[in-house]
Amino acid sequence: QAGGDFGQTGFAVRLYEGIPALVLTLRSVQLRCQFKRLRTHLILVSTIILLSAGSEAESARKYRDLCSIVYPSDATIEWECRTLRAGESLEKLFGEHWIDVVRFNRIDRRHAQAGRSIKVPKQLYDLQAFTPLPLSYPTAELDEQFVLIDLSEQFLGAYEYGSLRFAMPIASGEVKNPTPVGEFRLTAAHRAHESCLYMIEGTNRPYPMNYALRFYINREGVSYWIHGRDVPGYPASHGCIGLYDELMQKEQYGIPNEPELNDAKRLFEWVLGGEAEDDRLIQLPQGPRVYITGRAPR
């Protein structure tokens, strides 16, 4: 499977080759997910692909040296490489600037573990108001809302009439499951979305994709979303765009103790103009335009 998530797309699904041509209309989210998991297993058997291979690849890359990842904006900040030691925390090391440091490294606190090497600016104040994205985007000056995603920088920008309102780091698709590039539009929002394909590592619990905003459905019916997820400091998703969601991490892993990073929620509520009243899938007939450009670092 190419990546992304089968998600709640709300249309009929045709069974794969070798199975009688049958179209099932699945009305409940739970039944749709069960069917898609079964469909995925059949695909995996027929092509001899093991889902565990993806998990092993993720585990192998989890501790990669962040100093070796090159972003174009690295040249604008003087920094040095530092390896985190046992007992150290970003809060203790950088005080009130810890959030600036994690954003600069495109990493969350759960993944800032002992043994990881991170980029540390020689002057922490250089990171104040840091963003690798343009403050103005003339192409979107007529758009009330516009989303720019730069894969080369691993950053997302939310624009209002061409002016940058806020920016946030992302985790895009890894090498084998790249995030699609081009022009898209947000077509659906789902506050309590979850994956129908992937589980929380080491469990049988579906991976949460909270505050999900759908921007693309490919020909195979695979949905691509912007949503909350782990942000390990490098492209690691199956094609979706991941944003900080420390509350989800607290619920699933027990850390961090005091969640603060909530970029997924912030973007979600910006698009909707406030909090969602419930957990139903919300269609966005005229959602904001999304432009994805660049190439993710390897």
Q: What is each PLM-predicted segment?
A:
Residues 41-50:
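Bacterial N-terminal signal peptides
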Residues 51-61:
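Bacterial Sec-dependent signal peptides at the C-terminal "C-region" and cleavage site
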Residues 61, 197-298:
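Exported/periplasmic cell-wall-interacting domains
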Residues 65-97:
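Primarily a LysM-type cell-wall glycan-binding module
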Residues 67-74, 120-144:
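Intrinsically disordered, low-complexity Ser/Thr-rich linker and spacer segments
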Residues 85-112, 166-167:
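LysM (lysin motif) carbohydrate-binding repeats in extracellular/periplasmic proteins that recognize
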Residues 130-234, 288, 292-296:
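Gly/Pro-biased beta-strand-loop elements
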